Swiss-Prot record:
Cellular component, GO, one term: mitochondrial inner membrane
Membrane topology recorded in Swiss-Prot or TrEMBL: Multi-pass membrane protein
Protein's name in the database: Cytochrome c oxidase subunit 2
Natural source organism: Zea mays (Maize)
Protein function: Component of the cytochrome c oxidase, the last enzyme in the mitochondrial electron transport chain which drives oxidative phosphorylation. The respiratory chain contains 3 multisubunit complexes succinate dehydrogenase (complex II, CII), ubiquinol-cytochrome c oxidoreductase (cytochrome b-c1 complex, complex III, CIII) and cytochrome c oxidase (complex IV, CIV), that cooperate to transfer electrons derived from NADH and succinate to molecular oxygen, creating an electrochemical gradient over the inner membrane that drives transmembrane transport and the ATP synthase.
PROSITE patterns for the chain: COX2, COX2_CUA, COX2_TM
CDD domains from the UniProt entry: CcO_II_C (cd13912)
Length: 260
């Protein structure tokens, strides 16, 4: 029984993108947006290491050469033009190298697709999500709509993740441009999926847009990232990326179920 639990747990994490215990790094990127965030983090971390090494070297050198035993009579240095120019220009160059990719990524994340293949609307409630697929309805029909609640711990099946599983997943096709419209029906929420690099605030009376391009099939887990009341921690988000054929079959089945 223990081996079965471990095996199921291993394959669940291997095939899904979710937070793990004692995780220190990022989840694997599934969108160009998230890959850009990870790359920017690595670039900035490189400069942080350079600055840390330089500051430590200067500190150790000062302690070694300018202590009381080495220099009983302290030197009186009140001005140094060269060093002042260096410590003014060098940080400015570093900030420039950080700012250019940062602004490029920021504006690419803020861009909204003019003609996306699929539009999905996420509506936050206390404490669940409602999703609307409005691309498949005619003028006299309702859109494909369903609610997504967290599965209670007592109802979890073997291998499902605690506090992260939902009864109805958001199913999307992989390698397809999506547009997410996020809003709220009551208080502030935030629709966030780390592997997709998405965190979009759900504000009552306002529609916020974000674009997503999932590059690989898989199951991606997220949660509401805005404190919204007592059960804020029980608003998970699950996005399942499938092939275009499987997505079309899922939409057809959902429309049939909704009609019946």
């Amino acid at each position: 029984m223990i081996l079965r639990l471990l095996e199921c747990r291993f394959f669940t994490i291997a095939l899904c993108d979710a937070a793990e215990p004692w995780q220190l790094g990022f989840q694997d990127a599934a969108t160009p947006m998230m890959q850009g965030i990870i790359d920017l983090h690595h670039d900035i971390f490189f400069f942080l290491i350079l600055i840390l090494v330089f500051v430590l070297w200067m500190l150790v050198r000062a302690l070694w050469h300018f202590n009381e035993q080495t220099n009983p009579i302290p030197q009186r240095i009140v001005h140094g033009t060269t060093i002042e120019i260096i410590w003014t220009i060098f940080p400015s160059v570093i900030l420039l190298f950080i700012a250019i990719p940062s602004f490029a990524l920021l504006y690419s994340m803020d861009g909204v697709l003019v003609d996306p293949a699929i539009t999905i609307k996420a509506i936050g409630h206390q404490w669940y999500w409602t999703y609307e697929y409005s691309d498949y309805n005619s003028s006299d029909e309702q859109s494909l709509t369903f609610d997504s609640y967290m599965i209670p711990e007592d109802d979890l099946e073997l291998g499902q993740l605690r506090l992260l599983e939902v009864d109805n997943r958001v199913v999307v096709p992989a390698k397809t441009h999506l547009r997410m419209i996020v809003t709220s029906a009551d208080v502030l929420h935030s629709w966030a999926v780390p592997s997709l690099g998405v965190k979009c605030d759900a504000v009552p009376g306002r529609l916020n847009l974000t674009s997503i391009l999932v590059q690989r099939e898989g199951v991606y887990y997220g949660q509401c990232s805005e404190i919204c009341g007592t059960n804020h921690a029980f608003m998970p988000i699950v996005v399942e990326a499938v092939t275009l054929k499987d997505y079309a079959d899922w939409v057809s089945n959902q429309l049939i179920l909704q009609t019946n």
